[in-house]
UniProtKB/Swiss-Prot annotation:
Residues 215-224 have a biased composition (Basic and acidic residues). Belongs to the FAM76 family. This is Protein FAM76B. The gene is FAM76B. One of its GO terms (molecular function) is RNA binding. The modification N-acetylalanine is found at A2. Negatively regulates the NF-kappa-B-mediated inflammatory pathway by preventing the translocation of HNRNPA2B1 from the nucleus to the cytoplasm. Inhibits the PI3K/Akt/NF-kappa-B pathway-mediated polarization of M1 macrophages by binding to and stabilizing PIK3CD mRNA, resulting in increased levels of PIK3CD protein and increased levels of phosphorylated downstream target AKT which leads to decreased NF-kappa-B signaling.
Length: 339
């Protein structure tokens, strides 16, 4: 037998059979595990992860160095708005296709009508970028499942046909030998009585029935053996499950980062409010102390004025009493001196 052709992995350049390499980037199983395809935490586009700590694509890393951390886009809510309030994808789509419309899947106003060419790929639905990616991923998975089922069915049918071909010559030879025996012994059977002929027919019918019962017992063994297509499909499904897990982990990391940012923003707002409250309390206490000092000074001044007025009133009363007494003395003296 000729040796099967080997193909090089695009990452480690080691040679493997074609079935062991991935369909898209022709990577081996070890490279797929070491460098999985994950989604960027900012722009949500898929890229090959160089290290486990790297969760941002090269383009977003350059933009972070140049413009700083991005903000969420006002249309798609993806944290990729490095310049302004819109991400680069939404700005380009708005220039090309007009204002955004509501997505039929996520109900957000972030879907751009790409006319017939774009809708033809998603069965005539108006979807945003993230929803189109998820829809295409589901379609790809269903196609792969159908292919794996078809390959397993074809391999099982081909193996059963080869097994039948192996048994067919023996059966033909047995049938030819049986026919020769039947033709040679036909002359002998013709000389037998009808009862003996009936017994011979029963024996031949039993032997043929035993042969028919023995042949199907061998088929389940062949069907129980897994074909190469099934094993490769199982490996592909396991690899796709691993990539899905990495995607889920990156999504969870993104959610954790967004929640941390929200917590930081809320903490900052709480600190600012606390500062304002302390400033207002200090101002209130200062104003209250000033008012109290003013009230005390006014009360003291009022008491002093009241005391002064009371003292003056007393003096005036004394003067009035003295004047009234002097008048009385003057009147009595004038009465005594008169004849």
């Amino acid at each position: 037998m000729a040796a099967s052709a080997l193909y090089a992995c695009t990452k480690c350049t080691q040679r493997y059979p074609f079935e062991e390499l991935s369909q898209g980037q022709q990577l081996c199983k070890e490279c797929r595990i070491a460098h999985p395809i994950v989604k960027c935490t900012y722009c949500r586009s898929e890229f090959q992860q160089e290290s486990k700590t790297n969760t941002i694509c090269k383009k977003c890393a350059q933009n972070v160095k140049q413009f700083g951390t991005p903000k969420p886009c006002q249309y798609c809510n993806i944290i990729a708005a490095f310049i302004g309030t819109k991400c680069q994808r939404c700005t380009n789509s708005e220039k090309k296709y007009g204002p955004p419309q509501t997505c039929e899947q996520c109900k957000q106003q972030c879907a751009f009508d790409r006319k017939e060419e774009g809708r033809r790929k998603v069965d005539g639905k108006l979807l945003c970028w993230l929803c189109t990616l998820s829809y295409k991923r589901v379609l790809q998975k269903t196609k792969e499942q159908r292919k794996s089922l078809g390959s397993s069915h074809s391999n099982s049918s081909s193996s059963s046909l080869t097994e039948k071909d192996q048994h067919h010559p023996k059966h033909h030879h047995h049938h030819h030998h049986h026919h020769h025996r039947h033709s040679s012994s036909h002359h002998k059977i013709s000389n037998l009585s009808p009862e003996e002929e009936q017994g011979l027919w029963k024996q031949s019918h039993k032997s043929s029935a035993t042969i028919q019962n023995e042949t199907p017992k061998k088929k389940p063994k062949l069907e129980s053996k897994p074909s190469n297509g099934d094993s490769s499909s199982i490996n592909q499904s396991a690899d796709s499950g691993g990539t899905d897990n990495f995607v889920l982990i990156s999504q969870l990391k993104e959610e954790v980062m967004s929640l941390k940012r929200l917590l930081q923003q809320r903490d900052q707002t709480i600190l600012e409010k606390d500062k304002k409250l302390t400033e207002l309390k200090a101002d209130f206490q200062y104003q209250e102390s000033n008012l109290r000092t003013k009230m005390n000074s006014m009360e003291k001044a009022h008491k002093e004025t009241v005391e002064q007025l009371q003292a003056k009133n007393r003096e005036l009363l004394k003067q009035v009493a003295a004047l009234s007494k002097g008048k009385k003395f003057d009147k009595s003296g004038s009465i005594l001196t008169s004849p």
